[in-house]
């Protein structure tokens, strides 16, 4: 069995050469659906949602097909894949397990039995974490703060962003924790009692002590905030982050996402006020309770064994080139 994610170049081709099944595991959707667009697309109209998956898949294929065919011919001893066919992992006959909470993003109705949504997977980092005394004392000295941080992502103007963050917290009367990260946030002209600056820290420990969170919208950070029942504002930079921002807003646990190039004082103030609404907190608590009984690791293992094919004659197990996505079929040319 080959286990992989859709972005790993060559996974289906290696499985074909070895004549063994493949199972895809991933943290964002790669299977076509009419319920939401491909996370790497920016399609806004529902009529284009399903097509967006095929287009993204095809664009990836067009960029790597020469390299893949070189691998197939020289290393895997397989015939090359034709110019307009090929796929990076969205074939409906390949089992997929998606690692997110079905209470946040339910399994789409047009996904078949080979697709599973298993729940988030978490590392327990909090149990072995010893917070600095200064942080513990600061947390004890006032109301729960709002966490703001963007991890390792670069910030174009960290001084300006820090100023916006501080002014938004002061305007809304909130204490704040700023994660300096790799973006250089938190260079204050003078220390402020209402602001605590820190470097990387286990989210599963910190978020339990926070009133709300503002972050970039990575799948792991999003999951940690929701598990801690924190209303969430997502400031997406790229990739699947806009997707998670939309899902958080759709679920009622945060405001509409603020793209990083639209980050401004009025928008951050509005986002903080949105998160302070008691109804939003109630929704966050409701979602966190629903997630309590999820075990993504166990769900992933169960999905793996459920989808493990029964042993068949060798002639039946060899992947067929006809199973690969065809761009010509997508546009009705066949």
Predicted regions mapped to residue ranges:
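Nucleotide-activated donor-binding/catalytic signature segment of Leloir-type glycosyltransferases, i.e.
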Residues: 173, 183-201
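Short beta->alpha connector loops at strand-helix junctions that form conserved
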Residues: 25-27, 217, 234-238, 256-260
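Nucleotide-sugar-dependent glycosyltransferase catalytic domains
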Residues: 1-145, 150-175, 187-190, 282, ...
